[in-house]
């Protein structure tokens, strides 16, 4: 007799404590505030990881390594070593201001800060069913990276190219953040309309 597990093969997935986009956005803002970074300023992510984060966590190290040592990966966070390993090519691109490389480092920063081994669990899930996005650590790290580097609340009136240039993020991240900024503006307008009530 074929079981449901045989019909729907399971895959192993990492599970993080649930966080929605609003909570992650607040965490990104709080980190900027803790580091003394204005909300509308570009973040020098390399200097932050090499100089600022070790002040908060003296045991932390950003470790560029030859590309061949991270085959198939751009970077890897190892919380138990208090380190983020990054391909030299990605590190060099981030120093030059490459948007994707900067996003990769900010993504790994999120893993380091919020996804310690104590907080991550693993489960076998049905590969045909979508995992709740609020517990997906990769999605959480993607959102954090975008909100930390290009806060959605600071993008009013900007184009995709404006966001890329001002905040140093990839085109995809800029588009996604502008979409989030538009969603926030609509929600605020809707709340304001409800508070004002019907006009006489």
Regions found by a protein language model. Name each.
Residues 1-200:
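Active-site hotspot residues in diverse enzymes, especially metal/ion-binding acidic/histidine motifs
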